[in-house]
UniProtKB/Swiss-Prot annotation:
<keyword id="KW-0963">Cytoplasm</keyword>
<dbReference type="InterPro" id="IPR011768">
    <property type="entry name" value="Transl_elongation_fac_P"/>
</dbReference>
<keyword id="KW-0648">Protein biosynthesis</keyword>
<keyword id="KW-0251">Elongation factor</keyword>
<comment type="pathway">
    <text>Protein biosynthesis; polypeptide chain elongation.</text>
</comment>
<dbReference type="Pfam" id="PF08207">
    <property type="entry name" value="EFP_N"/>
</dbReference>
<comment type="similarity">
    <text>Belongs to the elongation factor P family.</text>
</comment>
<dbReference type="Pfam" id="PF09285">
    <property type="entry name" value="Elong-fact-P_C"/>
</dbReference>
<protein>
    <recommendedName>
        <fullName>Elongation factor P</fullName>
    </recommendedName>
</protein>
<comment type="function">
    <text>Involved in peptide bond synthesis. Stimulates efficient translation and peptide-bond synthesis on native or reconstituted 70S ribosomes in vitro. Probably functions indirectly by altering the affinity of the ribosome for aminoacyl-tRNA, thus increasing their reactivity as acceptors for peptidyl transferase.</text>
</comment>
<dbReference type="InterPro" id="IPR013852">
    <property type="entry name" value="Transl_elong_P/YeiP_CS"/>
</dbReference>
<dbReference type="GO" id="GO:0003746">
    <property type="term" value="F:translation elongation factor activity"/>
</dbReference>
<dbReference type="InterPro" id="IPR008991">
    <property type="entry name" value="Translation_prot_SH3-like_sf"/>
</dbReference>
<dbReference type="InterPro" id="IPR012340">
    <property type="entry name" value="NA-bd_OB-fold"/>
</dbReference>
<dbReference type="GO" id="GO:0005737">
    <property type="term" value="C:cytoplasm"/>
</dbReference>
<dbReference type="InterPro" id="IPR014722">
    <property type="entry name" value="Rib_uL2_dom2"/>
</dbReference>
<dbReference type="InterPro" id="IPR013185">
    <property type="entry name" value="Transl_elong_KOW-like"/>
</dbReference>
Length: 188
């Protein structure tokens, strides 16, 4: 399926020179004073792991890989693999940890994820858009800090660092976006 260069998003898998490339960073849309607008895209080769930056004209069309998507439940880690179970047929598959890279700490036991297959081979795992995590380290609460929009660093139970509002304390649960690792709100 062809998509416009302006439609490229993080996580898209593109076919370039007969290889599969995953968009690993949010594409930058640029319109210089001279010349046409372009999109700067950082991609990673799924076979070799090599990263590269490409610049596409806004009018270019690229081939997006046709992927089959299925729901799987994360069960456990086994060596360098994730063990996932199909939620419909209860079949188990092994998927290399490397597919998730920096998102691996967000994976929790029994989490439902979407696994994308290309020619029946698992290529990508999509996590839920948000997860609820507990704050394990942060500075003490400052009285009267609810009116300000300032943030302080916090370490979550999975070791990820995120900026949180001043009024949050250790032990509180928060909602975090998995795509850009940012604080959303206090968990209800």
């Amino acid at each position: 399926m062809k998509i416009s260069a302006n439609s490229i998003r993080t996580g898209n898998i593109l076919v370039c020179n007969n290889d599969l490339w995953v968009v690993s960073k949010t594409p930058e849309h640029t319109q210089p004073g001279k010349g046409g607008a372009y999109v700067q895209v950082e991609m990673k080769n799924l076979k070799t792991g090599i990263k590269r930056n490409d610049r596409f004209s806004s009018s270019d069309y690229l081939e997006k890989a046709e992927l089959e998507q299925k729901d799987y439940q994360f069960l456990y880690f086994e060596g360098n693999d994730l063990i996932l179970m199909d939620t419909k047929h209860f079949d188990q598959i092994n998927v290399p940890k490397g597919i998730l890279e920096e998102k691996l700490p967000f994976l929790t036991e029994n989490m439902i994820v979407k696994v994308e297959f290309y020619n029946e081979k698992p290529l990508n795992i999509e996590l839920p858009p948000t997860v609820i995590l507990e704050i394990s380290e942060t500075d003490p609460v400052i009285k009267g800090a609810t009116a300000t929009a300032s943030y302080k660093p916090a370490v979550l139970e999975n070791g990820i660092k995120v900026k949180v509002p001043q009024y949050l304390a250790i032990g509180e649960k928060i909602v975090v976006k998995t795509d850009d690792i940012t604080y959303v709100e206090r968990a209800k």
